[in-house]
């Protein structure tokens, strides 16, 4: 399955919520009719069955983190294998992806931009260049922008905006060094409440 490269607004309208696919500078809230379904006239959304709700939630979370279906299924299998709340563990696995950590630290204005920085070898983890977006970051890992990439205007602008909005509590960032520490896995209470991961658990448990 190829990665979706079409209009971001269309996806947000389909899921009925901002998927954070654009930077905070260009928030979808004011530009997309999120309450309307995709299409010229925004057809009325049909009432969904339990299965439909579970499927939509899975698709929403998958799109927020920019993960393909096969990858997402593997993350769920790994979360289900571990001890603890499967839904919360799933979110933690997604949150600890390198591209997501780069985004959370403010080095990329969107997860897609952060993924590009990683793929283009602009990111260093514990002193080593890592170009795999799905690389799993561990508590205590130091993530920084590679020296030759530090002058990129988009990185400076993204970090400036992220600092204004506020960085999450599970990362710390030195803006002067363009370096951050992944302090710990986030608790469920620290993540957005607009996600119902239990529906995903129910979807895969059928």
Swiss-Prot record:
Q: Which domain of life is it from?
A: Bacteria
Q: Per the record, a Pfam family?
A: S4
Native organism taxonomy: Bacteria, Pseudomonadati, Pseudomonadota, Betaproteobacteria, Neisseriales
Could you name the Gene Ontology cellular component terms for this entry? small ribosomal subunit
Q: State the name under which the record lists this protein.
A: Small ribosomal subunit protein uS4
Q: Which gene encodes it?
A: rpsD
PROSITE patterns annotated for this entry?
A: RIBOSOMAL_S4, S4
Keywords, comma-separated and alphabetical: Ribonucleoprotein, Ribosomal protein, RNA-binding, rRNA-binding
The record, for InterPro entries, names: Ribosomal_uS4 (IPR022801), Ribosomal_uS4_bac-type (IPR005709), Ribosomal_uS4_CS (IPR018079), Ribosomal_uS4_N (IPR001912), S4_RNA-bd (IPR002942), S4_RNA-bd_sf (IPR036986)
For molecular function, the Gene Ontology terms on record are: rRNA binding; structural constituent of ribosome
Fill in the subunit field for this protein: Part of the 30S ribosomal subunit. Contacts protein S5. The interaction surface between S4 and S5 is involved in control of translational fidelity.
Please state every residue range assigned to the domain named S4 RNA-binding. Answer: 96-157
Name the job this protein performs. Answer: One of the primary rRNA binding proteins, it binds directly to 16S rRNA where it nucleates assembly of the body of the 30S subunit.
Enumerate the Gene Ontology biological process terms.
ribosomal small subunit biogenesis; translation
